[in-house]
Amino acid sequence: MVQTTEAKQVCRAASTVLFPELEFGVKPCGKYTREDFSEILSRIAFDQEFANTGGKTLQLDRDEHVDITATARNSLAKSLLYHLRNLSTDAITDQFDGVRDRVFEVLRSQRRLPAFVDVAIDLHEWRFYGSADTDHVLTTYPDLGTNKAFCFATLCIVAPRTRFTLAVVPMDANGFRAKRDAVRSLLETAKQYVSIRHVYLDRGFFQVHVVAELEQQDVEYIVRARPSSGMKDRLSVGAETVADEYTMQRKRKPTAAVDVTVFAVPHRTSEDEHVWFVTSLDVDSSTARAYAAAFRRRWGIETSYRQLGEFLPRTSSPTFSVRLFYFLFAVSLYNLWVLANVLASAETVPETPLISTRIFRRFVLSTDYG
């Protein structure tokens, strides 16, 4: 059981990791302050709202005069977006790197980091309804009325209640080169903070150059596979599992080849179907099910993505710096919510979060943004 006072303390302590790191390039003579921008960002993140609405509600709560029927953009929201549009990518990523550093300083000081962690790499698509020619917008599968999206590769810890997002890489393309480079960057960043035991990747990363990069990074991995006919031929009629040596290769330039173990287990819900993987681990038919079960833990990341979405502001902006800032701000708030629950849980990790996102919102919104 967590008392109100204790919950408030850990939530506000977590928030002090974030807000002092935020910089917007505000001039001393500006109409609005860094604290104003931090507060409106928090509101639109927790409420999943547009900046214009968030600016109006914030000023109404301050008893300031606001024309709620005005069609022109709210002045506070307009100023926030102006400053975000003028931030460089490096200026944005540097400050959120600082937030991550402080999160892990707290975890180390509290001795809450395990000796080794499993991690999952995945793609997070933020759907876009504007022009396909917009910078950083990729064409992807149709969903929610569009086939365009801003895309971010993420690396997360795979463990109940401690699913921190360790690294984020914006994607400028969706080919194998971009994915290979993203995997390299994510792993190199993650290794600065944790010791990696296994890396799990979904079928979107089942490409020989990506697997070759995993080998180069010297990490143990399991990748969900799209089975070729050569793979399927290894499964005997009536067999439930299979594990065998296999060579992934690309014969067209740029060529690549990687020796892996391929294994398959029965699909959990579809009869006569199997789920296929490639791995660097020593897997045989007797251990294939156990490794497939270990891979299923990465599916908990889907829950993390939904919870991350609870901190993502709404926007129709085509400007990449706005999207990047919003996404990294959401990741930071999500990580701080996880951190608050870690700090509130003493020595044990509960099955469900002690502090809900709604309670976290209430305590953070009442904090000092200085």
What are these regions (language model features)?
Residues 66-89:
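Major-groove recognition helix of helix-turn-helix-like DNA-binding domains
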Residues 81-157:
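Active-site-proximal, Lys/Arg-enriched surface segment
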Residues 26-28, 286-295, 307-327, 344-348:
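Short, solvent-exposed helix-loop connector elements
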Residues 1-32, 41-48, 53-72, 172, ...:
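A short, flexible helix-boundary coil/loop motif
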Residues 176-232:
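Domain-level cores of phosphate- or acyl-group-handling catalytic modules
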Residues 140-194, 275:
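Electropositive, glycine- and tryptophan-enriched low-complexity nucleic-acid-binding patches
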Residues 40, 54, 115-125, 155, ...:
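Short, conserved catalytic/metal-binding motifs centered on acidic residues
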Residues 217-307:
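An anionic, glycine-rich sequence signature occurring as long contiguous blocks
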